[in-house]
């Protein structure tokens, strides 16, 4: 399954017949997996969660994230694979698994960055229910606060924001980045209880466009810079990205 799946994902040909053949081979392997999951009672490979699940679960999770974005093919929610979907649902209830898995965005960003795979669609929508869970928001805020200085240095070095430096002085940029990261952390903790500073373009309470531009670059960069589980759990990463999506348009 792994070999044919990644051949399908990384294939550079645009020949429709060849891609269809690879997809058919993948579906055949998934059908075999579907049958394997039916050999024992319960949703796992054997009668209870085991080493086999530990070996295969993360791999299957990556495939479920990558295939819709890079090949337009869905495993999750596909009625052709009821046992595989029951397997994913069972894994979602295991707290330890949720601590070590990647989120869908991390899986898709890594496939493109490491292997140069070319997507055929956009990133999968974030799970809004996961993003609103208080423990995920709190963890994301904590990880951001604990690593604030490292995040600022990374943004300054790699986001391109230094191009906005005035007379080569990056101190004002550093302050603006710090301000917007704090705004993000506060939103993660407080949610909608504290209004965001939106709608200031062209109004009396006018935002400094230079500072807003720095903040926009910083947040857009860090949204896709975080990696689960390296930086935080998958649930916290989802909450982090959703918070950026909410805060970013409120900068102006």
Predicted regions and their residues:
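Extended amphipathic alpha-helical segments with heptad-repeat/coiled-coil character used for oligomerization
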Residues: 64, 69-70, 97-128
């Amino acid at each position: 399954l792994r070999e044919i799946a990644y051949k399908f994902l990384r294939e550079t040909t645009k020949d429709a017949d060849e891609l269809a053949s690879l997809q058919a081979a993948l579906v055949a392997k998934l059908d075999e997996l579907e049958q394997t999951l039916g050999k024992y009672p319960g949703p796992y490979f054997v009668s209870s969660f085991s080493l086999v699940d530990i070996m295969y679960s993360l791999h299957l999770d990556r495939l479920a994230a990558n295939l819709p974005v890079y090949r337009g093919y869905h495993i999750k929610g596909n009625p052709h694979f009821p046992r595989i979907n029951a397997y994913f649902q069972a894994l979602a209830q295991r707290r330890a698994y949720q601590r070590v898995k990647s989120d869908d965005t991390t899986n898709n960003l890594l496939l493109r960055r490491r292997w140069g795979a070319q997507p055929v669609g956009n990133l999968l929508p974030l799970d809004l229910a996961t993003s609103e869970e208080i423990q995920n928001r709190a963890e994301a805020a904590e990880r951001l606060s604990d690593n604030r200085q490292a995040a600022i240095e990374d943004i300054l070095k790699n986001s391109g924001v230094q191009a906005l430096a005035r007379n080569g002085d990056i101190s004002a940029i550093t302050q603006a980045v710090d301000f917007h990261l704090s705004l993000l952390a506060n939103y993660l903790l407080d949610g909608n209880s504290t209004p965001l500073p939106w709608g200031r373009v062209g109004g009396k309470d006018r935002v400094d466009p230079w500072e807003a531009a720095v903040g926009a670059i910083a947040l857009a960069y860090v949204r896709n810079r975080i990696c689960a589980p390296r930086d935080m759990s998958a649930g916290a990463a989802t909450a982090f990205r959703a918070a950026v999506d909410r805060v970013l348009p409120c900068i102006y």
